[in-house]
A protein has these predicted regions:
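Catalytic-core signal marking the mid-to-C-terminal active-site face
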Residues: 199-311
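Hydrophobic beta-strand segments of well-ordered beta-sheets in folded domains
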Residues: 4, 31-36, 181
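Single conserved hydrophobic/aromatic residue that forms the stacking wall/gate
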Residues: 1-6, 10
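Flexible, glycine/charged-enriched surface loops at secondary-structure junctions
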Residues: 27-30, 67, 102-109, 145-151, ...
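Glycine-rich anion/phosphate-binding loop at the beta-strand->alpha-helix junction
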Residues: 37-207
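Alpha/beta enzyme core
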Residues: 19-30, 56-60
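Active-site-adjacent beta->alpha loops and helix N-cap segments on the catalytic face
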Residues: 11-18, 46-49
Length: 311
């Protein structure tokens, strides 16, 4: 996604995207990114510049994520029910505006309830209130049969530590369990959205993979109930290790993380006693050193660099 408060920026971006897509007008035929816009300024008023951006995006067929990001006790009521009442109305106002300009234009219903610490005014993206508010936002979007975007797995921690894991995990799982379609301000973000980390990117990838696995739930069918496997184990070796039923489940039913430590303590200590941050840093460095995809032709790369201020 892309984001800017100035409509003229999108004109230049579309020119760049056309080069990548194959020529003038090609991006609009098959857009491959969307714009993040906040046309509503809480509480309850349109922002003139942002509305201009909406017009520009519709002109170039750029799908839109219309974001409402009020803050509890500051730009929205401090009560959670009151907050959701206002933010839902604001996001609906964005939808109505887009539909009035061009009926049916693709828009993600992005109601992002945000929380501040009312003692200090500091943004609190990793709070329990943030978790429950964004889960409720996802549920409201589903109730309206609209594609939802919510803010989740944010953290106020500045390091990859226990606070980081606690805050990211609870907000990620809450949004997913509530049926959120898209999540934002998530992977790699730290320090109340003021920081970003390569280590956080790879750790968050595993966190979300675990969340996805939990969402899959438990499939119940005749084979998975395992009657024959239980029979064979009881009358045979007395365990399930190495059995065909176990090996099939191993590949199908389990997620195996690359970074999470599951060694017994002595093995972990003998291997350097690395914590999650250290393991993530090593993994991130390997990716940065080896993963160099080339999505543009040399001609496209040269044209973009000649027309735009890119080093």
């Amino acid at each position: 996604g892309v984001s800017s408060a100035a409509s003229d920026v999108y004109k230049r971006q579309v020119n760049m995207l056309d080069i990548a897509a194959g020529g003038p007008g090609e991006f609009s035929k098959r857009p491959f990114l969307k714009a993040h816009i906040s046309p509503l300024i809480s509480p309850m008023r349109y922002g003139e510049d942002a509305v201009d951006v909406v017009y520009e995006c519709i002109k170039h067929n750029i799908p839109i994520s219309c974001i409402t990001a009020a803050q509890a006790g500051a730009t929205a009521p401090a009560t959670l029910a009151g907050f959701l009442t206002q933010s839902l109305a604001e996001t609906l106002a964005s939808l109505i505006m887009v539909h009035a300009i061009k009926p049916g234009f693709p828009m993600v219903f992005s109601n992002w309830p945000l929380v501040i610490d009312l003692r200090t005014g500091a943004f609190s993206g990793g709070s329990g209130e943030t978790a429950v508010l964004n889960a409720a936002s996802a549920q409201l979007s589903n109730w309206l049969n609209l594609p939802s975007g919510v803010a989740c797995s944010m953290t106020d921690a500045k390091a990859i530590d226990a606070q980081y894991g606690m805050e990211k995990g609870i907000t990620s799982f809450a949004a997913a369990s509530a049926g959120g379609n898209l999540i934002y301000e998530s992977s790699g973000m730290t320090a109340s959205l003021l920081g970003v980390s390569f280590e956080a990117f790879v750790l968050d990838d595993e966190m979300h993979s675990n969340t996805y696995r939990a969402l899959r739930g438990i499939e119940v069918n005749e084979d998975n109930l395992g009657y024959n496997a239980i029979f064979d184990a009881v009358l045979g070796d007395g365990h399930f290790l190495g059995g065909h039923h176990t090996l099939e489940a191993m590949e199908r039913d389990y997620f195996y993380p690359k970074l999470a430590d599951r060694d017994e303590p002595k093995t972990w200590f003998d291997n350097g006693a690395e914590d999650a941050w250290q393991r993530a840093r090593t993994h991130a460095k390997k990716i940065l050193a080896s993963h160099n995809p080339n999505y543009l032709s040399k001609k496209q790369d040269k044209e973009i660099r000649s027309r735009f201020n890119i080093l």
